[in-house]
Amino acid sequence: MSQLIFIPLLISLLVTKGKIRFLNNFESVLALSLHYGILVLALPIFILLYKAKKQPCSILLKVTTEPIILSAYATTFSTAFLAITINALFGLIIAWILVKYEFTGKETLDAIVDLPFALPASVGGLTLMTVYSDRGWMGPICSGLGLKIVFSRLGVPMATIFVSLPFVVRTIQPVLQDVEEELEEAAWCIGASPWTTFCQISLPLLTPSLLTGTALGFSRAIGEYGSIVLIACNIPMKDLVISVLIFQKLEQYDYQGAIVVATIVLIASFGGLLIINKVQLWKQNLSK
């Protein structure tokens, strides 16, 4: 195992041809950056995949087909998809308002968007509980509509919506700022309605960033733990998600099961991001 830990480092040394002089030229900076990225990102992922590969096939098959795990996967991905679908719509609207309009409190709204980035996950979960519990501000209203947010399955998408919204807004906002207003004004001059202008001019330009934001938000929603463990009841076959399930397996000293489940989530998240990047490149090539 100790030899495997140094394999990525050896690869990086070969790529840079052993030129590791301390920041005295571009190659040294590149080598240092490559080593840092491998140590921080690639090495933990590599070790996790290596641990999963060492598991017998019988254990892999048993773990991946357990009803509780299949239910947790279904809950995780379905609620994350629901959350990011809602955030794709409202995140686009919020980014549009922040860029296109001037109003009192704009700076405050712009700062609030980043709150999920700054808040600890447990604080976010406690905030949602305070708002949506039976004695919270929105709890009685939701109860009157027949909706129970806290300690129910609805708490999972509510938590993932909260943590993933900034990814959509912040990836769309800079692209929207760079869209030339002359294009929209030209469309209006030839009689196009605002909706037609948005659909045929603005939206195609925003699609790559929208896809990136939704992919990042989806990955963030899949991995959310701190707020979900507080706002949901985390009951198997009901609202248990993968991140909480992994922690429960570690508490039960089921390290093999935790590694297998975590590896599947890792592969799924990486595959989703890879597909989104391919789609972006394809759209960029079409636009040229």
From Swiss-Prot:
Protein's membrane topology: Multi-pass membrane protein
Assigned GO CC terms: chloroplast membrane; plasma membrane
Start and end residues of each ABC transmembrane type-1 domain: 73-276
Organism domain of life: Eukaryota
Keyword terms of this UniProt record: Chloroplast, Membrane, Plastid, Sulfate transport, Transmembrane, Transmembrane helix, Transport
Pfam families: BPD_transp_1
Localization (cell): Plastid, Chloroplast membrane
Molecular function per GO: ABC-type sulfate transporter activity
Main location: plastid
Residue ranges crossing the lipid bilayer per the database entry: 4-23, 29-49, 79-99, 111-131, 149-169, 227-247, 257-277
Family: Belongs to the binding-protein-dependent transport system permease family. CysTW subfamily.
Listed NCBIfam families: 3a0106s02 (TIGR00969), permease_CysT (TIGR02139)
Job description of the protein: Part of the ABC transporter complex cysAWTP (TC 3.A.1.6.1) involved in sulfate/thiosulfate import. Probably responsible for the translocation of the substrate across the membrane.
Name assigned to this protein: Probable sulfate transport system permease protein cysT
Gene: cysT
